[in-house]
Amino acid sequence: MRRANLLILISLIAAPAVAQRINIPAEVTDEAALPRVMPRFAKAVIAFQQADQSPDPASLSRAQLVAGLYSDALASLGKLRAPLVNDPSPRVRARYLEYVLYARSRLTAIKTKTAFQGAYRETFHALISPLDNKTSALAVNHLSFDNLSQASQALEQDLAELKGKCAISPAESFKLISDYNEREVYRAFGSTSAELIAEDDARRYIIQKDVMAAMPDGGSICALIVRPRDRPKLPALLQFTIYYDQVTLLRDARRSASNDYVGVIGLVRGKGCSRGEIVPYEHDGADAAKLVDWIAAQPWSDGKIGMFGGSYSGFTPWAAAKQHPQALKSIMVGAPVAPGIDVPMEGNVVWNFIYPWPFYTTTNKALNDEVYYDRARWAKLDHDWYASGRPYRDLEKIDGTPNPIFDRWISHPAYDAYWHSMIPYKEEFSRISIPVLQTAGYYYGGPGAAVYYLSQHVKYRPDAEHYLIIGPYDHLMAQRGTANPDGDVDTISGYTIDAAAKIDLTEVRYRWFDYTLKGGAKPAILADKINYEVTGANVWKHAPSLAAMATEAARYFLSADLAGFPDDAYRLGTAATAAAIPLSVDLAERRDVDAQTPGGGVQDKALDSSNGLVFVSEPLAKATEMSGLFSGHLEFTANKSDFDFQVSLYELSPAGDYFQLAPYWSRTSYVQDLSRRNLLVPGRRESLDFRSSRLMSRQLQAGSRLVAVLSIVKEPGREINYGTGKEVIDESTSDATTPLQITWFGGSYLDLPVHR
């Protein structure tokens, strides 16, 4: 055994630096052998790190924990925590405490020759109990036994990827050690953590679970309430949600209470302890408003309530605001959905990924993880539906399980009265006088419907106190920021996030409500109504409106001239040309059902031009900032009554990297009016004017080119429009007897928002 360990150490130290590979024992993939193999491997990695002139102290401390070198680990953790303990951010102050707690407990157990659990209790009381509420609320999140499942899954994935390998990179080694350490820490804490956290909570807070809040119609809402013990009356912060995860929701309510608010979680009817049918969206506004009234009448309430949440829980504050409850004084939402606008469809084109969601949220009192995360089932559904060419309405028949909620949604393809009833509509926005803060991201599901809500609010109420924070975030980061327990998320889908964009939006939440409910200072980041990070420039900018993000529009025409780079691309030019460009798409073709889509990253070496045309500009003479919403004018003839199209914008850097800017897609018949379908006349020259609802902000490099991909939506993950003019959900490949033929005319252009 010692000889094997020595050989590993020798191979590590003697290996050429350029190789940067660390040998791993074959037993590392054997779960039963891990307690014996991993400490030995960790010591080898420590030797590797010590040969480095600047070892990463966080990685080193984890390796020391796995190796059983607890005193060394505490020394490393002490160096990590020394500059953090007096930081103004409680998130920073709480960093690495779980590892300190684990190492101290192990040392105490060894020195006193007692069981770990007893040492853990003693160390918890010594380390966690003295913390202030804000820091402890974050620290205990990292001690929960509920984290074990996620840690175990991460380790299982690591081990699966190691099969057949005899050496791995330093990064892979550190990840393996970190994930193994994480699992062992949570295994050791076990159920004792829950007992200790409950004791600590009872000392700091009054927690009421499964509170039945009576509604005027005889129904009830299930609520969780957490309030500080030493404060008789406080403003309340309400999150009204369909996502009933007891652990996560208690953390949110505790976090609010730690910031001197009453934290209230309200669940939609039928969830948790309440009775009734679970119906997403349709009744949430009225119920949330009544819950606001109920909270205001409680003896611990000072009568002022704020609402917050993200995604679905970002929709509910808007739904409540539609009802104008008197006690609702402020809202903050992240990547909020707007039913009928961005879910279950965007641009009136339905997304398949929404299909499993009703099963996830409505089939039990909590959440149906087993069904929702059955990725093989949903991938097969997409594949089989697309390959079959059957109508979109047949998704539930192909899946084999009725999905009445999804069926009801897709039966409303226009933004009609069904959707209007759920959130403010047109002039109803004019009556929303409370302050609003929205947070959003540029990428994937990051925008939510934030731009829609903002645009409508300021259109109908120009003096609205409505702020937006937006940066290089996806759906989750748009709600929380880049903060994670050990620091910040560094990348998003291949793109390295600017340092300036690394912010904790949850901290902003409490500063926002301090400002709007307690008369505190406005958060510094809200220097103007629109607050946006310019990617690539590493700077935040501020503007009074969306339009003011740009100083001019740069017009680029879709030219029939070849660009010469890449080979099959057309020119994105600054002058109109007379020539037209044909595009033919066989909507019945299914040989691409198993095709791997190229590109897709925020920063990538490829892009997807399937069923479309690529347009490329000349290199930019100098660095150029593009910030705001892009728009376009398309002139064309088509041989069908309708089609779904997409425009995707990219920066192509001199190094050959594609950077996402912004996409736009829509059903042609709804571009003019989301609420009313306007079909094309086949063969007649038509024109469309559109504006994106997704913001972009990027500093493009000198020498970069602009790339626009104009394509037809035809893929396994979205509804397919076959162009007959009848209801799209009833169309099939039998309606695609002839390919879609479009002629794009030279008068077509894109207006891109430039700031000089």
Regions found by a protein language model. Name each.
Residues 390, 483-756:
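C-terminal, loop-rich substrate-recognition/catalytic regions characterized by aromatic stacking residues
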Residues 191-232, 620-622:
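N-terminal cap/lid segment of alpha/beta-hydrolase-fold proteins
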